[in-house]
């Protein structure tokens, strides 16, 4: 959520930023309502002051034994008018809030201008895609042939876009989760959190999923609970309605969770295999920082996520996301894309975002500066560290052998207790 003063003081800049994001918000109506509200509050304050004065006058007349009935009648009319105006102010504020909730975060000045993912800018690559002397298979074929993935059974039990991991497949998924957590905790300094997999509506609002993206969320029937689309939601909301001691910043958290998404509007896009599932595992990175440190922390977070892929020997590239592809809550975002041989292209495996104070305003997360000054909103950052199912898929594709087996990356062997998955 943007600072109202920012919109009020520089509406044209906000309007341009919204257009660059490809979003829509009625800034003119917002400004009209904002001015109306401010005028109404001034008038309301004047009426309340008058009521206070007349109350004193009534009390004085009564003490003097004089008739105060006319003044009492006027006071009743005045009180009714105040009550009516308070209701009008409430209605104006509710409409203001509804518009404010639709206004996206403002892109950082360093974000490239563009309309879609075709305008994202590659900034670096790591590793060389492997050259195969045989035709590489897609990960879903490899997994089914090795009997470590079962899409058909999951479809019978639940439906499409779900998977059973079996045998060494289940062990590989678990090994990846533990490896990622261990790396981020032991080397990068994150504190692990194991969050609830359900949150209520206010938490989804706090991180920006609601009200705009409700159609992409799984709601628990008959309750106010939602299955989390990412651990970013519960971990960020751990600090909702709190003031953090400035000496404790920055705060680093990592969390494993299952994630649940409708993937509305994604029909036909990567629907085979593990790339676009309704339920998937992810290790999430979340940071809370002082405003002047958040972009430095974004670079660190992105490097932390990259190190997972480097340790696994998976080629990848990093792109900075353009304005039109940036999303609702982020001011700046990097995507890390892993090489998938059967696709012949890089596929997103992590997004690392700086939301500045956008989520903090929605969730009311502040910090007390070290000098003891007035509490300010923190900056929040989040990133995948990384998506586990997509990493599983990338390992199957990049480490597949001609005989159908898959070599286990060396860093995972202590977790797996085997070097190769084979028939």
UniProtKB/Swiss-Prot annotation:
Amino acids binding L-serine: 230-232, 284, 384
Catalytic activity: tRNA(Ser) + L-serine + ATP = L-seryl-tRNA(Ser) + AMP + diphosphate + H(+); tRNA(Sec) + L-serine + ATP = L-seryl-tRNA(Sec) + AMP + diphosphate + H(+)
UniProt keyword annotations, A-Z: Aminoacyl-tRNA synthetase, ATP-binding, Cytoplasm, Ligase, Nucleotide-binding, Protein biosynthesis
GO molecular function: ATP binding; catalytic activity, acting on a protein; serine-tRNA ligase activity; transferase activity
Cellular localisation: Cytoplasm
Residues that hold ATP according to the record: 261-263, 348-351
Top enzyme category: ligase
Cellular component terms per the entry's GO annotation: cytoplasm
GO BP: selenocysteine biosynthetic process; seryl-tRNA aminoacylation
Main location: cytoplasm
Family matches, as PANTHER family: SERINE--TRNA LIGASE, SERYL-TRNA SYNTHETASE
Record-linked NCBIfam families: serS
Family: Belongs to the class-II aminoacyl-tRNA synthetase family. Type-1 seryl-tRNA synthetase subfamily.
Domain observations: Consists of two distinct domains, a catalytic core and a N-terminal extension that is involved in tRNA binding.
HAMAP family recorded: Ser_tRNA_synth_type1 (MF_00176)
Assembly behavior: Homodimer. The tRNA molecule binds across the dimer.
Protein known as: Serine--tRNA ligase
Designated gene of the protein: serS
């Amino acid at each position: 959520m943007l600072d109202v003063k920012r919109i009020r003081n520089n509406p044209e800049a906000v309007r341009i930023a919204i257009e660059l994001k490809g979003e829509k918000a009625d800034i003119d109506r917002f400004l009209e309502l904002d001015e109306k509200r401010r005028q109404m509050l001034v008038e309301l304050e004047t009426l309340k002051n008058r009521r206070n004065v007349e109350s004193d006058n009534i009390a004085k007349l009564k003490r003097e034994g004089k008739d105060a009935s006319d003044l009492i009648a006027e006071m009743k009319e005045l009180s009714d008018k105040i009550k009516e105006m308070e209701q009008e102010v409430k209605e104006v504020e509710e409409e203001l809030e509804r518009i404010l909730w639709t206004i996206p975060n403002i892109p950082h000045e360093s974000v490239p201008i563009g309309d879609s993912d075709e305008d994202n800018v590659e900034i670096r690559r790591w590793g060389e895609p492997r050259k195969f002397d045989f035709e590489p298979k897609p990960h879903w074929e490899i997994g089914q042939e090795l009997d470590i993935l079962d899409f058909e059974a999951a479809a019978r039990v639940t439906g499409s876009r779900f998977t059973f991991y079996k045998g060494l497949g289940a062990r590989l998924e678990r090994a990846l989760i533990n490896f990622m957590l261990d790396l981020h905790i032991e080397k990068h300094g994150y504190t692990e959190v194991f969050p609830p997999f359900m949150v209520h509506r206010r938490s989804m609002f706090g991180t920006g999923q609601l009200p705009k993206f409700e159609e992409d969320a799984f709601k628990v029937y008959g309750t106010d609970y939602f299955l989390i689309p990412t651990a970013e939601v519960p971990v960020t909301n751990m600090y909702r309605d709190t003031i953090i001691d400035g000496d404790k910043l920055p705060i680093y958290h990592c969390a494993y969770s299952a994630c649940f998404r409708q993937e509305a509007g994604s029909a036909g896009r990567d629907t085979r295999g593990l790339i676009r599932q309704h339920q998937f595992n992810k290790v999430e990175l979340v940071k809370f920082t002082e405003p002047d440190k958040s972009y430095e922390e974004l670079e660190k977070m992105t490097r932390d996520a990259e190190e997972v892929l480097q340790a696994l020997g998976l080629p990848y590239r990093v792109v900075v996301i353009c304005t039109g592809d940036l999303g609702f809550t982020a001011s700046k975002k990097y995507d890390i894309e892993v090489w998938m041989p059967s696709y012949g292209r890089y596929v997103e495996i992590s997004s690392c975002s700086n939301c500045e104070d956008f989520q903090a305003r929605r969730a009311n997360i502040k910090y007390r500066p070290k000098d003891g000054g007035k509490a300010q909103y923190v900056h929040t950052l989040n990133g995948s560290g990384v998506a586990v199912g997509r990493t599983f898929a990338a390992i199957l594709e990049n480490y597949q052998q001609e005989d159908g087996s898959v070599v286990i990356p060396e860093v995972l062997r202590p977790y797996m207790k085997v070097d190769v998955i084979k028939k």
